[in-house]
Amino acid sequence: MKNLFFSAYKKVFSYITSIVIFMVSLPYAYSQDVVVNTTKHLFTVKIGTTRVIYPSSSTKGVSVSVANPQDYPILVQTQVKDEDKTSPAPFIVTPPLFRLDAGLQGRVRIIRTGGKFPEDRETLQWLCLTGIPPKNGDAWGNTQNNPKNSSPTMDIQMSISTCIKLLFRPDKVKGDPTDSADSLTWRYKGNYLEVNNPTPFYMNFYSLRIGDEKINLSDLGSKDEIKNGSYVPPFSSRDFIIPVKNKGKATEVFWQVINDNGGVSREFKSTVQ
């Protein structure tokens, strides 16, 4: 009787073990047979300029060319934001949302809707365009290069926003930033190099060096809480971190600024006070 019990027990145990082994092996076998393809699609917009000058006298607004550099269609969302890139600005962009087919160009128009701006200086806003992927099931949203491929595919779609400067310029402000870029003054202030802008223009730096050392235009340090990039606003000042090798040693500073057309000025030079 005891032998019969152990014999039956061994058969049941062997059967259960076989099931467990099969269940453990099944995912492994499946992972060996099925290949999951991964694709990545960017949804971005190329803007035909690096900055937009909006004259205060404009009644019809200003237009900007845009392009779809991808080989598949995208939706383009347009908006204007305040200098902080968060708050809405008193401008509209038409069309606010539109489809742009692969490799094609289009135009958007920026129109002021209100707002009270200083008359003695420029005001900075941001024109932002965002490429938007299709939703599941949208007929226009097929980005697959090989739709007949039977292998499962994980499609990573990345929506990218591109923002450029929109400079509202009063009629009283004449000329180009490069005409008065040599008016900037510089002085040492602790571990920082301070630049003062006495002009009505936003001075957008292309390059900056003190002595032979280049200054990192994107490194504002912990002192400057406003992440305003590589520019100094009108009638304002800002600080740059001084390279360690040149703290208080170099006496000359050199810089280039970007003009209204996105070009680069000649190099200016001044003595550090």
Swiss-Prot record:
Disulfide bonds join 128-163. It is found in: Periplasm. It comes from the Bacteria. The keyword Disulfide bond applies. One of its GO terms (cellular component) is outer membrane-bounded periplasmic space. One of its GO terms (biological process) is chaperone-mediated protein folding. Pfam families: PapD_C, PapD_N. Belongs to the periplasmic pilus chaperone family. Required for the biogenesis of the pH 6 antigen. This is Chaperone protein PsaB. It comes from Yersinia pestis. The gene is psaB.
